[in-house]
Amino acid sequence: MRNSLKNIFLIVFVSIISLGLYQYYQNYSEARSFNNFLDSAALVSSLHLEASEEFKNLLDFSEISREEFENKIDKVVSNSKEAYEIINNTDASLTLKEKELLSLATSYWLQGLEMFEVSIITLIDNPNSEKIQESIAQSISDLSIGDRSYSEFLFLTKQNATSEGTFLPVLYEIEYVGLEDNSFRFADLLVEKAKSSTGGLFLVRNLSISGAEFKPNPIAITEEDYSVLL
């Protein structure tokens, strides 16, 4: 009888220890995966902080040339693509609401920035383009969705970062256009700003004068049939 009780006690004790060790491993594994995700999120945040600040400067349009605009928007889109790749290369088995929100943000940001770049270049090449405001408005709408998704990601991440074993890196507040209620009005304002630019935004690149031909008109004809030029 004593041996039976002793064996039962031993089995219960071993089971409790095993369960505790398993739970500890599970918590450790989840914390490590979450920390790895946060490291990637910090890179994404840093890239989009730089891109969003440059993008806001571009929206001024006041004294920027076409070449400067193209170089800067290329850098902004490049940063966005890099951030998109980083978040999509994270552990596919990781199912987190935070990851879902950040993935949504990077996707809409990239989509909006690429459409914005194409739309403004189209406007520059053809200032009388019809319905250009629609594509610009769509890009603004996409950027706004990205801003909102990132804001929710940031809130949720900070809320859950209090868990034991979680190390919260620097995650920046990022906003491209904010919560824009009227993207079409925003687009109209951007088109007006762009068209009033004084920095050479609408100058055509790689356009040069290869030669000039002087064809003066005569102002009089002499009796000897010679033309008198001014």
What is each stretch, according to the model?
Residues L123-P127:
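Solvent-exposed N-terminal domain segments of exported/luminal and surface proteins
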Residues A31-L38, S45, L179-V191, A212:
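Intrinsically disordered, low-complexity Ser/Thr/Pro-rich tracts
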Residues I140-F184:
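Membrane-inserting hydrophobic helices used for pore formation or membrane fusion
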